Amino acid sequence: MQRSITYSFAGPADKNQVRRLLSECELPTLYIHRHLKSFMVARAGKKIVGVVGVEVYGRTGLFRSLCVDEAYRGRGIARMLNERLLAYARTRKIDRLYLFTLYAEKFASKLGFRKIDRKRIPKSIRSTWQFRKSHSYPSVVCMMKKIR
């Protein structure tokens, strides 16, 4: 029997499962606790099988950590998490989302993100640890999506 997937904001009790899933997807877990309330999770029963987050910096946001448990891929979970995150971003009056990626440029493009020059990234996003760390990897791609 296939379990139905439910979606909700992450709560403090979800921190360990979110960290586990991000680690399995080889995504950073640093500072998750600071932004957990703006992460969305997908659940199959009590198990978190998908996650996505946004760090809010005024009218800009840093898109974080979209991943789905390997056993649950191909079911539209990533797309649904993305849609719910965009709806949340709109309620927060975020105009633009930024992301940094090494491997997911093609997938991010399918979600409406476009490659941009790092010089176009606003100061609020340049102050994040992700931006600072991106300088360590010359192949990191900077992307942006307008959502208004």
Identify what each model region corresponds to.
Residues 15-51, 129:
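Active-site rim helix/loop that mediates acceptor-substrate recognition in acyltransferases
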Residues 41, 47-55, 60-67:
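Conserved beta-strand in the GNAT
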Residues 121-148:
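C-terminal "cap" of GNAT-fold acetyltransferases
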Residues 4-17:
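A short beta-loop-alpha structural element at the N-terminal edge
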Residues 14, 59, 103-104:
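A generic "binding-loop/recognition-motif" signal
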Residues 87-103:
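Conserved GNAT acetyl-CoA-binding A-motif
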